[in-house]
Amino acid sequence: MNECEPCSGAFAEPTLADLTQYRRDLHQIPEVDFDLPKTIAYVHSVIDELPCEVFEPCRSTVCAFFDRGSEHTTAIRTDTDALPVTEKSGVPFCSTHAGHMDACGHDGHMAMALGLARHIAAHLDELDRSVLIVFQPAEETTGGAQFICESGTFEKYHVDRIFGFHLWPDLPKGHIASRPGALLAATSESTFTFFGKATHIAKAEDGADSMEAGMRFILEAYDYMAQRAHEEPCTFKCGLLQSGQARNVISSRTYI
């Protein structure tokens, strides 16, 4: 925990070069789910020097509280985990962790949050409310946000507003965008298993083709979603299909 007295002007504004360095440093050390030791250490290396209370309310979560003595606090949330993806970009700051990559922009999100923390430190005396910056793990997987919500942090620090953000490459440089209501979709992941009966393809009539059943399910589900696309903004897609063990044997089990 780091507790410092507010001292506006004693801390330098972050530069674009600083933010670029943060992003590239973090891009090289992608970690997934709650297993984020290097990422957490990097976040601490920046915010521990600032006039804020630094604490970890739950597993792999780092918070920085800039106290203005107000009963009102604005929270800013960034995600910190990467994806189980192999990077092949060839850039000088490419991932050094095999099989892991910041492919969804969380390195950029963290860089912006660290830059914001330094900006707040430089202008702390000018704020009329406190600020809590939250570095959240497991956004891509098991739901790190739930543990933060259940920790009592938002109640303890009187959070009455919270903002998240996401990089959007289609926006012009220097622009941000929002809209009333829902903006980004929540996701639910499902696994479907189809059971059949394996037989030699020459005797296909004696078997039950789980692969055909799975493919028909996908096509009919896609057709159904297309028919109701005008009713609500939602989508259904399958990204993985595993079936069969031999070319000449009817598949007895299919996973989607």
Model segments located where?
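Polar low-complexity intrinsically disordered regions
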Residues: 1-6, 10, 17, 177, ...
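Acidic/His- and Gly-rich active-site-bordering loop/insert found
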Residues: 2-102, 107, 111, 115-127
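Histidine/acidic-residue-rich, glycine-tolerant segments that coordinate divalent metal ions
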Residues: 83, 91-101, 108, 125-252
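A glycine- and small/hydrophobic-rich beta-loop-beta segment
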Residues: 255
